[in-house]
Amino acid sequence: MSTMTLSESNESKKIASLNKLFEGKQNVFYINDNFTIYDTAFYICRGGLPLSLVDDKNKALKITKNYCSTLFNFENSKNQKFKNKKPELFKIILKIYARNISTEARRKTILNDVCEHEDRTMDPDTFDSYIEALNDLYIIKDIKAWNPNFRSKTTIVSAPTRHFVDPSIATYVLGISPADLLNDPNTLKLLFEDFVVKELRTYLQLLDGEIRHYRDGNGLECDIDLHLAHGKYSLIEV
């Protein structure tokens, strides 16, 4: 499950074809002449919910915010994974997750930050049950590490990169707007990477591929690896 891409919402120039790029049939050179940094920040905060695709940008942001505020209204859920789960604890975990978006933050690091925020201890199994529920709810979706040579002696960092299904959820739990992102370039960069991952993940489904990341012990790294079933891959630095 994924939210709409800019192509699906007709907000993309649709100049490049991922399939043609893999086949080596397309060279893309594009000069941006009418797309601003604010537009990027807006799309990150609005997300790809169909209901939010309205002309009024303030209204669009409000629709997304209202949707995100209802994510944990499952008091009457019959699913055992969600029973007895505290909505406020979900929000705290998500906030810590959002602070570590597009990074390889360790599970233990996130758990420790949650405990510090709550000024309490939290059983690791309980923490894992909340993370599992967030995955089941299609709220978070990490990227696994890629190893191009399974027999190589090079040490591959195996930690996943932390990502959301849609970056708008991260901006919601952090309480930030497009204007806030313009004043915080570092956060904008990390959320933009998450946005790119969201878009590419959807396009890659049509090619029967998967998205990974790469970093080895020598410091070589790549934000995104698009890996197809027949062995072709593309390395992307955001």
Regions found by a protein language model. Name each.
Residues M1-S2, Y214, I236:
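Hydrophobic residues at beta-strand termini and immediately following loops
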Residues S2-E23:
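Conserved small helical "lid"/interfacial subdomain of P-loop NTPases
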Residues T3, P167, V238:
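Active-site donor-binding loop signature of nucleotide-sugar glycosyltransferases
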Residues S7, P50-L51, S234:
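Glycine-centered loop/turn positions within well-structured domains
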Residues S9, G47, D223:
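Residue-level signal for inorganic ion chemistry
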Residues E23-T70:
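Amphipathic alpha-helical "lid/sensor" segments that cap RecA-like P-loop NTPase cores
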Residues L53-K232:
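Accessory nucleic acid-recognition modules appended to NTPase machines
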Residues K232-V238:
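Active-site ExK catalytic segment of metal-dependent nucleases
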